[in-house]
Amino acid sequence: MVTVEEVRKAQRAQGPATIMAIGTSTPQNCVDQSTYPDYYFRITNSEHLVELKEKFKRMCEKSMIKKRYMYLTEEILTENPNICAYMAPSLDARQDIVVVEVPKLGKEAAQKAIKEWGQPKSKITHLVFCTTSGVDMPGADYQLTKLLGLQPSVKRFMMYQQGCFAGGTVIRLAKDLAENNKGARVLVVCSEITAVTFRGPSDAHLDSLVGQALFGDGAAALIIGSDPDPDLERPLFQLVSAAQTILPDSGGAIDGHLREVGLTFHLLKDVPGLISKHIEKSLNEAFQPLGIRDWNSLFWIAHPGGPAILDQVEEKLELKPEKLRATRHVLSEYGNMSSACVLFILDEMRKASSKEGLNTTGEGLEWGVLFGFGPGLTVETVVLHSVSA
């Protein structure tokens, strides 16, 4: 007769969780940031707000974003004037869009990840789906299971309304699932569509306007598992540790509220200051066991909440400009895609490392850090170990 301890030992994987494939996807509609203020004020019938438009132009110029992708086209917005108005009842119209489109965009990213992984999708044992775009029952996890034709026995986790830190959260959860379930292969999907937050401008709500200048649509997917089969699977990054914390004195710094008018967004000006003030504590706690104190010796994947956050973190930690190159590249090419951003940056980093002939997936370096920042203020910290190219 076996003991509980023996059963538990047999259930656990041997090695650390590993990212084995990455896929990304965006809507087809691409928006140029330089012409966006004119388009945005025209489509929302707000061209009479001349001073506010100038303010928005400056926001877009300072955003360090070149382009974004958005499901909401001019045609869709023309058909849904309440989505364009400032604070008009519009939740039903928004929900009708995202409940269908969020799983569909997630499917595109997931298919790319599964193709790279190279294994039959029947081997996927767990699904973690994350979105801040709408809420439904059964959830986007169920819809994606049906769209992909996954096994009905796949073990699903649905994470709604987490916000911008959640790219770290899904990795932390997938790590625990992979390491505690021998043979588990976890499909992780983050899919975000700004149809829940888009609305016209108001000079009484400038933080909403900041969101209109920053947010973009995108989905990203990972395959995560422990003990990769060397003949069939190719590891990209190992997940060494993962932590979450709420920053002190940060209540109300970033809030989102789902209302009749859609998802409203509030942020305090001091968000970059709060993050940069406390980030070294998270780094010390994560890397002390490894004896690492030189933050420039790491490869960096940081959620690009906005250029000010990146600038202040860079300054506070005395990071060399190239440390946040991959992060700034994704911000420039896609905008802030909430939970999906850090997964896009992982993809950008491994591709650039390969293209440049570097000897690891992490810009030629061995150890790296992934940060998620979002409502709370909540910070996710993941320690990564790169894989030899």
Curated annotation (Swiss-Prot):
Name the EC number(s): 2.3.1.74
Transmembrane residue ranges = none
Keyword hit for Protein transport: no
Catalytic residues identified in the record: C164
Q: Which family does it belong to?
A: Belongs to the thiolase-like superfamily. Chalcone/stilbene synthases family.
- Tell me the GO molecular function terms: naringenin-chalcone synthase activity
Q: What is this protein called?
A: Chalcone synthase E
Q: In which pathway does it act?
A: Secondary metabolite biosynthesis; flavonoid biosynthesis
Q: What is the lineage of its organism?
A: Eukaryota, Viridiplantae, Streptophyta, Embryophyta, Tracheophyta
Pfam families associated with the record: Chal_sti_synt_C (PF02797), Chal_sti_synt_N (PF00195)
Which species does this protein come from? Ipomoea purpurea (Common morning glory)
Q: Which InterPro entries match?
A: Chalcone/stilbene_synt_C (IPR012328), Chalcone/stilbene_synt_N (IPR001099), Chalcone/stilbene_synthase_AS (IPR018088), Polyketide_synthase_type-III (IPR011141), Thiolase-like (IPR016039)
